[in-house]
Each structure stands twice: as structure tokens, then as C-alpha cells.
């Protein structure tokens, strides 16, 4: 089964929501596997037109899954890939 393809759409600096969502996304990586691509809206005119007022945005397999905020647990559910749960 291929890994989910996650695209994190963000911008250069000065985006507190982007920083917070990225931290939650990195935390989710402790529990699920996925491929991550980080895209900056400043460098892609199409992305800028589509998402400038929605960032941060996560696309999962090409579909919008999150905009603005999500917790680690919400991300795990939305990305929903092959789990590799840690046992405490």
C-alpha cells in the first residue's frame, strides 16, 4: 500500500498558524507514515491564487484535508495511513 502524499502549503516566515500546524504534523509522524512535500505559496502563482487566504493548508493525496488548524490526533485521522503505533 503506497504512503499517503501530504502537501503542506505555507509561506515564508511570519505565519504563526503555519508554525503550529507544522509542529502538529511532525508530531503525527511519530504515529503514521506519509510522504511530505512543503510548498511555499510565494514561489507558485497557482498556489498563491488558490490558497493565499487559507494557509496553512494540507492536501492529502491531492485533496484539501486541513486549513488553518488541526491537532495531532485530527491529523492522524485525516491522513489515515498505515499506522505504526508506539506502545508505551
Language-model region placement:
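Thiol-based oxidoreductase modules, predominantly thioredoxin-like and allied folds used
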Residues: 34-45
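Structural micro-motif
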Residues: 49-58
Amino acid at each position: 500500500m503506497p504512503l499517503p502524499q501530504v502537501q503542506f502549503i505555507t509561506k515564508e516566515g511570519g505565519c504563526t498558524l503555519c508554525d503550529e500546524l507544522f509542529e502538529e504534523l511532525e508530531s503525527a509522524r511519530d504515529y503514521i507514515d506519509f510522504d511530505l512535500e512543503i510548498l511555499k505559496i510565494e514561489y507558485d502563482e497557482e498556489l498563491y491564487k488558490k490558497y493565499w487566504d487559507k494557509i496553512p493548508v494540507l492536501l492529502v493525496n491531492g485533496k484539501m484535508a486541513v486549513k488553518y488548524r488541526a491537532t495531532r490526533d485530527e491529523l492522524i485521522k485525516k491522513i489515515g495511513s498505515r499506522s505504526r503505533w508506539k506502545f508505551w
